[in-house]
Structures are given as structure tokens and as C-alpha cells.
């Protein structure tokens, strides 16, 4: 499989065409961004870590029957994935009060929720990726009610798999963001990535943060935090 021309470049990844109409080549970048791109920095090794962690987690989900776009890891920073039409919604699942939810509800960060909350955010940089209701989604016409129901069900299924998997590594899954795509056959599958860029991950005992909040809040060395997650997941750490 060959990497051909650049199709799209986002904050964290570059997407390239391949000679297969059904596959695209993903390259993870060493860039870190926060606050809708207002804070930016190049962090050597971040792309490798997100690629390695996403590979491990997508393989775990595939093992239990969850359909994803992941095909294979091509290099330390690259993956081959199925080409899908991305649904322009970020699906956020929350198990513990943190981040914007703490501010929005006026509740203390770290409060454990009795059951998970699923939220939808409209993917639009100009609007700041706003929180939307299912009624808003219908008005925006970006997903049908049936698709929204599938997204919610898949997010909750993935949440339980990841909660258990991270717990075995002594990590608490606080919350995480997912993106989904539609195949040519009309099936909804998991796309994008699952990494410390898209999850809040805390040590189950100390609540030490191993995610992008380290960068957002200037809490320490980002690559050290991501290396710790990779090590606990059983990947090859470069520490």
C-alpha cells in the first residue's frame, strides 16, 4: 500500500489517499492543541504515542466485536484505516464530573456519576464545537434519530469495555470523545482515535492525570504522562 497525496490535515493528524478507494493512510502529528487551537505546541514523540495507544485500544475493541475503521499499524506514527464518511458529531461519554461539565453544572471535579452521561457536540471549529441536543441534531440534519440511537448505544458499549480495560491497568476512565463514520454499505463504525488526547485518564488511587489536561493546565511533561498510559496498557514505552 502506497501513501499518495494529502487529502486533509487536522490539528493532530494528516490523512492521505492510497491506491485503494476503500482505504486511507493516517499520520499522527507531534502537535498539541488546546482551547480550540488557541494553545499550540510541538511535542516530540506525541504522534508515536497516540498512534501506539490507539492501535492497542482499537484492537481490544475489535476483539470483543466492535466494528472500527482500524486496519493495521504501518509505522510508529502511521495507520491504515477504512475510508468512511465522518458523522460531524463528537460523542462524549462521562463517568466522572470533570472539565466543562464541572463548570456547566457547578459540581466538584472528581464526583463519580451514578451512571454514564452521553453528550453530543457539533463538529464545527467556527462555532467552537457546541453541545447539541437530539432536537438540534435533527434541525442540523447531520444524523437521523436512528443513527443517533446507534451512536449512543455504541458509545455506552465502548465505555464499558474501556472502563474494564483501563481498570485492569489501575487507571480510571473519567470521560472520552468518540467519532464515528458511515461505510459505503451504510454501517456505522468507530473512527478517528482513542488516546490520551481524547480521554481523561486518572490514576485510580492518586488521581494523577495521564491525559491532555497535563498540557491544558501546565501540570507537567505530556509525553511522560502518555508514556505511562502506553506502559500500563502493555505497549512498548520509550522511557
Swiss-Prot record:
Any one GO biological process: cobalamin biosynthetic process
CDD domains for the chain: SAICAR_synt_PurC
Keyword Acyltransferase: no
EC category name: ligase
UniProt xrefs under PROSITE patterns: SAICAR_SYNTHETASE_1, SAICAR_SYNTHETASE_2
Keyword Nucleotide-binding: yes
EC number: 6.3.2.6
Transmembrane spans: none
InterPro entries linked: SAICAR_synt/ADE2_N (IPR028923), SAICAR_synt_PurC (IPR033934), SAICAR_synth (IPR001636), SAICAR_synthetase (IPR050089), SAICAR_synthetase_CS (IPR018236)
Catalytically driven reaction(s): 5-amino-1-(5-phospho-D-ribosyl)imidazole-4-carboxylate + L-aspartate + ATP = (2S)-2-[5-amino-1-(5-phospho-beta-D-ribosyl)imidazole-4-carboxamido]succinate + ADP + phosphate + 2 H(+)
Source domain of life: Bacteria
Gene Ontology terms, MF aspect: ATP binding; phosphoribosylaminoimidazolesuccinocarboxamide synthase activity
A Pfam match: SAICAR_synt
Pathway: Purine metabolism; IMP biosynthesis via de novo pathway; 5-amino-1-(5-phospho-D-ribosyl)imidazole-4-carboxamide from 5-amino-1-(5-phospho-D-ribosyl)imidazole-4-carboxylate: step 1/2
NCBIfam families for the chain: purC
Protein family (similarity comment): Belongs to the SAICAR synthetase family.
Name this protein carries in UniProt: Phosphoribosylaminoimidazole-succinocarboxamide synthase
Source species of the chain: Bacillus anthracis
Lineage: Bacteria, Bacillati, Bacillota, Bacilli, Bacillales
Gene encoding the protein: purC
